[in-house]
Each structure stands twice: as structure tokens, then as C-alpha cells.
């Protein structure tokens, strides 16, 4: 199974970003903890990019303990960079559980 994933750093925070706009894969809390484990891939947060009909993307954030986070400014900036390069856009609009 092919999964498009990135490891990025934003002002000292590091993220694993998984693009699920074309293929939806649900991760369990245990899998999220494993991905974030510094002895495996390792990151402060896991970010999932989801397809959104009205906006450029929907974003889900997970802390390294597997808990849900509403949003993360540094992580959102990393995703915005990816999406702006992909779509050649200067502005990106994304949904999070905290806000648009």
C-alpha cells in the first residue's frame, strides 16, 4: 500500500504529515504513538491531510501520546507550504477541529 508521507520541521517542532486525500487509512491510537516514537520515525505530532470539498484540505492533528489536538500553528505552516507548492497558490484554506 502506497502512502504519501512527509517529515517536516517548523520552528523546532517536527511532524510526520500523511496525505490521505486520495486514500483514507484510519490509524489507531497505538499506531499513532508508534509513528511518533523517537525510536521509530519520531515526531512531536502526526498530521493527517484529508480531502475537503470546499477548502484546500482538512487537517487532523495527533499528539505523540496519541491524543487529538485541535490544531498546531507550526504544523499548519508546514502543510500550507506543501499545498502551496503542489497547487502553485499563495493562500491555502484548511479546516481543523479548532477553526478554518
Predicted regions and their residues:
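A glycine-rich beta-to-alpha transition motif near the start of alpha/beta enzyme domains, typified by
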Residues: 1-100
Amino acid at each position: 500500500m502506497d502512502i504519501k508521507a512527509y517529515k517536516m520541521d517548523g520552528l523546532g517542532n517536527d511532524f510526520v504529515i500523511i496525505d490521505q486525500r486520495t486514500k483514507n487509512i484510519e490509524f489507531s491510537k497505538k499506531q499513532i504513538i508508534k509513528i511518533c516514537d523517537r525510536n521509530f520515525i519520531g515526531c512531536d505530532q502526526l498530521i493527517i491531510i484529508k480531502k475537503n470539498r470546499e477548502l484546500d484540505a482538512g487537517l487532523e492533528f495527533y499528539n505523540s501520546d496519541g491524543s487529538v489536538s485541535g490544531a498546531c500553528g507550526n504544523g499548519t505552516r508546514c502543510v500550507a507550504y506543501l499545498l502551496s507548492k503542489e497547487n502553485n497558490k499563495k493562500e491555502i484554506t484548511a479546516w481543523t477541529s479548532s477553526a478554518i
